[in-house]
Amino acid sequence: MIKNFLGLIIFLIIQVISLDNAFAFNDHNVREFLDERENLWPELYLPNFKFSNTSKDLIYPNWFEGNWLVTSQDLEDDSQAPVIYKVNFFKNNLNEVIGNRSKNSESIGKAIFGDTLIKVVNDPKSINKQITYLKDDLYIDSRITGRNQIKDDDMFFADELVIQTLHKPGASRVNQVETISKFQKCNRHNSNSENTLKPNICGFQYIATYGSKVGDPLVHSIKTSKFKLSFEFIES
């Protein structure tokens, strides 16, 4: 009985060690994948998410929790004024910090589309589906098909691929959009804020669009953009 019990304990310990090693291995491979995507920009092709896990939402470092004022500058077009919007991140029932997807999407949409945007609605049955309603009977159906991110308390580094279908009376148009996001706490010389509640967050987003050829690994990006983002903590 004791031997069996000890054998079970040893087996469980080995299993835990094996799982930890597996997670570390996967995280290392995901980091390599993300580094490669960033280095390839702007010569991007449709990503192949070998370690994609769309069953879980993106998880952010704890220092993301709260409300933020974001300033996004298009580095490819200096003539464009910065886009400014508010975003929110909160802890779910697993004590993980996640983004308020519908609220954040609506805030970004309002900053870009103005009054043309009516509302953004999450699919209650899936964290990967969202519908954006616009004026003139237009709406955009968004579905995330790939997601990779590393686990790092000092950095948020992730890649998502979404299929967007624009529906309008009598026609629809499909587009695939990849978003690579890399954020960390700002260095003091990179931050213009004197906010002492939380340090600012700095980083970049790389956007690539691939058109309507879904699943074709040979598809090259049609358009790429790079944005510099800064997050300033606000209390409401």
Where are these regions (language model features)?
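Classical Sec-dependent N-terminal signal peptides that target proteins to the secretory pathway
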Residues: 1-24
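Short secondary-structure boundary segments
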Residues: 10, 26, 138-140
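Amphipathic/hydrophobic helical signal segments and adjacent flexible N-terminal regions
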Residues: 20-67, 71-113, 209-236
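Surface-exposed, polar helix/loop patches in the mature regions of secreted/periplasmic/lumenal proteins
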Residues: 90-146
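Short helix-loop boundary/capping segments
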Residues: 124-218
